[in-house]
From Swiss-Prot:
Similarity comment: family membership: Belongs to the metallo-dependent hydrolases superfamily. ATZ/TRZ family.
Keywords for this protein: Hydrolase, Metal-binding, Zinc
CDD domains per UniProt: archeal_chlorohydrolases
InterPro entries: Metal_Hydrolase
Top EC class for this record: hydrolase
EC nos: 3.-.-.-
GO molecular function: hydrolase activity; metal ion binding
Sequence positions that bind Zn(2+): H54, H56, H181, D253
Matches recorded under SUPFAM superfamilies: Metallo-dependent hydrolases (SSF51556)
Superkingdom in the source lineage: Archaea
Protein name: Putative aminohydrolase AF_1775
């Protein structure tokens, strides 16, 4: 008896779940568009794909990191840099590709990846679908020449301020992003970060009193909540403030600590701070902030969504790869 091949559907009828509401209609695969309907349809649950606004994907070669403090793990000369220096570039690339494939299968389409290691570090992720590399130049000359989506630095306390100011200007001239970490451990590096007028800043968990200044300047802020938890730096007050900000985004930070899947990040965030609607917005806001179009994730109703009273809550709190029928990425 022959085997039967089930071809993917070209239309998925159901509900589209976004932070703006729930809509009945049809997802037309060929057009990558959702068409609303006046008729209630609920065969599938559909959501936008997710955008990971902060990763260090090369760290995937170091699964799992030991329980040390922030500086000992990721600071200059710390565990991460010592261990990565012992791994060849081919292995690093293979681990990045694996982490990206796993996360894309879970609905995360794009990754803003903070790259270390100069041009060699950029080569590790070159050509990997969905990875948007942000370089960390160590000289003005390197910043002028490097081909990347933008530039990104760790804490202002780790780098020469004059160099970062010059790279910031180069980013403007070359129409590239400029990003920086700030407020992860304390407030000491926040004013310097703010003065650089970055296109977005990562963390701010330990400095809630300065969040308003970034909001008033309309500078997007990325939270990496599982990473904060790992380092003992959770601050619910900061996340609650950020949940009210339309330019709040989510990332996953170091792949040696957390998976790069935004489903996993949303699950953790939901149980820590609630505000599931804001969390879903933060997992998809980066498309608009950085000028990309989202795709769609089609979930079946066989498991998590089977008898749900609220599909948005199920999506943010518990939906997993077992529930995914198809991921459509532009």
């Amino acid at each position: 008896m022959g085997e039967y091949l089930t071809l993917p559907m070209e239309v998925y009828s159901g509900i589209l779940v976004t932070h703006e509401g729930v809509f009945h209609g049809d997802l037309i695969v060929e057009e990558m568009a959702f068409e609303e309907s006046r008729v209630e349809k609920d065969d599938f649950v559909i959501s936008p794909t997710f955008f990971n606004a902060h990763t260090h994907l090369g760290d995937a070669a170091l699964r799992e990191a030991p329980r040390l403090d922030l500086v000992s793990i990721v600071g200059p000369g710390g565990y991460k840099h010592r261990m990565l220096s012992q791994i060849d570039s081919k292995t690093l690339r293979q681990e990045v590709e694996l982490e990206v494939r796993i996360s894309r299968d879970a609905g995360t389409s794009h990754f803003l990846d903070f790259r270390e290691g100069g041009k060699a570090g950029l080569e590790i992720v070159k050509g990997i679908d969905g990875v948007l590399p942000l370089a960390r130049p160590t000289s003005v000359e390197e910043a002028e020449e490097v081909e990347a989506f933008g530039f990104a630095y760790s804490s202002a306390r780790d780098h020469d301020l004059k160099l970062m100011e010059e790279v910031r200007e180069i980013a403007r001239r070359r129409k590239m992003l400029f990003a920086i970490h700030a407020g992860e451990k304390d407030c000491a590096d926040v004013d310097a970060a703010l003065a650089l007028e970055p296109d977005f800043v990562v963390h701010m968990n330990s400095c809630p009193e300065k969040i308003r200044e970034f909001v008033e300047a309309e500078i997007p802020i990325v939270s990496c909540i599982r990473s904060n938890a790992f380092f003992g730096l959770l601050n619910k007050k900061s996340y609650e403030l950020l949940s009210e900000y339309e330019k709040w985004m989510l990332g996953t930070d170091n792949a040696m600590i957390s998976t790069a899947s935004m489903l996993d990040e949303m699950h953790f965030a939901a149980y820590l701070i609630g505000k599931e609607k804001a969390i879903l917005r933060a997992a998809t806001a980066s498309y608009a902030v950085f000028g990309f179009r989202h795709g769609y994730v089609v979930f079946n109703r066989n498991c998590s969504f089977r008898r749900t009273s609220d599909p948005l809550l199920t999506l943010v709190r518990r939906a997993g790869v077992k529930d995914i029928e198809r991921v459509l990425i532009l």
